């Protein structure tokens, strides 16, 4: 599981260090690689362990092949994905299309989201978390958990 928020830099080639805690979680689970893809709700990159990606792909591939709206979502979901390995220094190379999608500049933030990880441009992340969540939404959320 992935938890916590970590500030890092991303270089001009698109390399950024995956936080040590996240690398340790991947290693403990026997996950040698991650899959990077567009996060559909905000301009961020979502990182998933290979096993989580495999589960999602199976569900997506079981989606109705005759429903155009579903297939459009499948296309966006699958086509944005990139399997990546960590280098010897624990860095991940974020592909240019994903860097552009998320607006990743020099400073980035890795956010553990339980089974997945999000990668944000630092300014975008700060804007996102600064938005106040209405208390009724918080109550609804925890009432469903």
Swiss-Prot record:
Gene Ontology cellular component annotations, sorted alphabetically: cytoplasm; nucleoid
Main localization category: cytoplasm
Domain SpoVT-AbrB: 5-50, 81-124
GO molecular function: DNA-binding transcription factor activity; transcription cis-regulatory region binding
Domain of life: Bacteria
Localization, UniProt: Cytoplasm, Nucleoid
Gene Ontology terms: biological process: negative regulation of DNA-templated transcription initiation
Keywords: Cytoplasm, DNA-binding, Repeat, Transcription, Transcription regulation
InterPro entries reported in the protein's UniProt record: MraZ, MraZ_C, MraZ_dom, MraZ_N, MraZ_sf, SpoVT-AbrB_dom, SpoVT-AbrB_sf
Annotated family: Belongs to the MraZ family.
Subunit-level organization: Forms oligomers.
Protein name per Swiss-Prot or TrEMBL: Transcriptional regulator MraZ
Origin species: Anaeromyxobacter sp. (strain Fw109-5)
């Amino acid at each position: 599981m992935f938890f916590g928020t970590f500030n890092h830099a991303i270089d001009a080639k698109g390399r950024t260090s995956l936080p040590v805690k996240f690398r340790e979680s991947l290693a403990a689970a026997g996950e040698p690689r991650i899959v990077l893809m567009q996060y559909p709700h905000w301009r961020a990159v979502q990182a998933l362990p290979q096993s989580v990606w495999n589960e999602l792909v199976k569900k997506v591939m079981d989606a109705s092949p005759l429903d155009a709206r579903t297939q459009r979502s499948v296309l966006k979901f699958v086509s944005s994905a990139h399997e990546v390995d960590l280098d010897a220094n624990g860095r991940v190379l974020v592909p240019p299309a994903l860097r552009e999608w998320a607006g990743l500049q020099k400073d980035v933030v890795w956010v553990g989201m339980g089974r997945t990880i999000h990668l944000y441009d630092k300014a975008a992340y700060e804007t996102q978390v600064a938005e106040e969540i209405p208390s009724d939404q918080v109550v609804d959320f925890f009432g469903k958990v």
